[in-house]
């Protein structure tokens, strides 16, 4: 069996809560997952000081557990890159957009982590204000994401190189399932993305962004996909929901997702669980 602790939206900066971050760290030590997956929004305002704190937190976890992390929309310098996106200097715009993430976290926006029993392919969906993320609503500018062909190709390559018996997991930032409280999808191309991930053999999608914990099963390309949406570790909770993270457990027969919710003074404790049969022919 492989265990993946899935957290999201840490939002280092004013929304970060030290006691919750400490409890998350304690849970990682106690649960001893094979991997920790952080699906973006490490910072609140993409500030250098916030990235420094986020990096220190990730390094602390990495001393004992492998970590895979991707950027979220709050980690992108999207506002300052608007003019650059409209210019001919596309490469310069790209480098500016992710410059602080590259400096403090990683040069890789689509990282891959393989552990015994699973491969986690990061797929960047946080592109700031870009053509693929545009919708008809002004409020979506810089907030909504999309799955690009380039990033999808990297997922395909990661799965092709992975062990045949490894569970295929994709990690994105933006939620492909409409939030119960927000009523919004996080992706501009949700349907296409889900079909593409299913066609590549993915069994599980990890995401965040919506600040609302959720677990869904969807049918795409004649295959079932499980979507684990982690809540936020910060105080930027939605509609009175509790801060939370998800623990994923995958064995030969089942894929289980347990939500751990914040309780004061106990810390993060199990609150609900979901179980799904594995895709036919899959092993872990």
Language-model features: locations:
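Active-site-proximal beta-strand elements of phosphoester/diester hydrolases
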Residues: 2-11, 117-133, 169-171, 225-232
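Active-site neighborhood of phospho(di)ester-bond hydrolases with catalytic His/Asp-centered motifs
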Residues: 7-8, 36-41, 66-73, 169-173, ...
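Active-site-proximal segments of metal-dependent phosphoesterases and phosphodiesterases across multiple
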Residues: 130-146, 153, 161-204, 210
């Amino acid at each position: 069996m492989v265990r993946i602790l899935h957290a999201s939206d840490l939002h280092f900066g004013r929304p970060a809560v030290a006691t919750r971050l400490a409890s998350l760290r304690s849970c990682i030590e106690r649960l001893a997952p094979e991997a920790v997956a952080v699906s973006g929004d490490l910072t609140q305002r993409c500030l250098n000081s916030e990235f420094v704190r986020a990096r220190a937190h990730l390094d602390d976890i990495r001393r004992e557990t492998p970590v895979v992390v991707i950027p979220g929309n709050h980690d992108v310098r999207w506002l300052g890159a608007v003019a650059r996106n409209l210019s001919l200097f596309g490469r310069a715009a790209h480098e500016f957009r992710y410059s602080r993430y590259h400096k403090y976290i990683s040069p890789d926006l689509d990282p891959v982590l393989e552990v015994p029993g699973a491969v986690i392919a990061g797929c960047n969906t946080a592109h700031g204000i870009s053509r693929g993320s545009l919708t008809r609503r002004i409020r979506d500018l810089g907030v909504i994401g999309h799955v690009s062909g380039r990033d999808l190709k990297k997922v395909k390559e990661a799965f092709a190189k992975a062990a045949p018996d490894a569970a295929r997991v994709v990690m994105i930032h933006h939620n492909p399932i409409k939030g119960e409280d927000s009523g919004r999808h996080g992706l501009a191309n949700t349907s296409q993305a889900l079909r593409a991930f299913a066609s590549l053999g993915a069994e599980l999608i990890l995401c965040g962004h919506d600040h609302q914990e959720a677990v869904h099963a969807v049918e795409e390309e004649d295959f079932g996909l499980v979507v684990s949406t982690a809540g936020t570790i910060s105080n930027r909770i939605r509609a009175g929901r509790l801060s939370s993270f998800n623990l994923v457990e995958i064995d030969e027969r089942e894929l289980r997702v347990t939500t751990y919710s914040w309780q004061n003074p106990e810390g993060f404790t199990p609150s609900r669980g979901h179980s799904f049969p594995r895709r036919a022919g899959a092993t872990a």
